[in-house]
């Protein structure tokens, strides 16, 4: 899927990358998920744009707390974008 290129999306990507490069290295590792919350949000914004991708990132950040087990949590695909299986006959 091609990367979104509207100004809001590019700005949000720049902010996330700024956090990843300038702030995150100075903090202890705390994310319970793979990919990390910032990488997840970056991928979601690149895939779905600033609004939907940003919303997915906010939802992910709300789930990242000590009482949640975490684990592998990839950015979801759009409904209907997964290959469909033919019905069994």
UniProtKB/Swiss-Prot annotation:
It is found in: Cell inner membrane. It comes from the Bacteria. Residues 69-89 are annotated as: Disordered. Keywords: Cell inner membrane, Cell membrane, Membrane. Pfam families: YidD (PF01809). GO terms for cellular component: plasma membrane. It is a peripheral membrane protein. Its main location: membrane. Belongs to the UPF0161 family. Could be involved in insertion of integral membrane proteins into the membrane. This is Putative membrane protein insertion efficiency factor.
